[in-house]
């Protein structure tokens, strides 16, 4: 799931959320907005078992995927588009 909240100016707060049944262990959101760097936006487990991380982004198009332990890649069906290159987010 992806939540978007428009902030003052041209920034949007984007919250990425994975369900409880996602693979165990650390998961990072990696994408064009962070140089595809694992660990830079690591997801935090919430009390309800979901995992989230929030980033602020200016307008644009961003490719991203979730990277789980063991090199497991996950896409987000809530993205604006999903294809063989991953998920696409339009702000």
Residue ranges and their predicted role:
Residues 9-59, 67-91:
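Aromatic-rich carbohydrate-binding modules that target alpha-glucans
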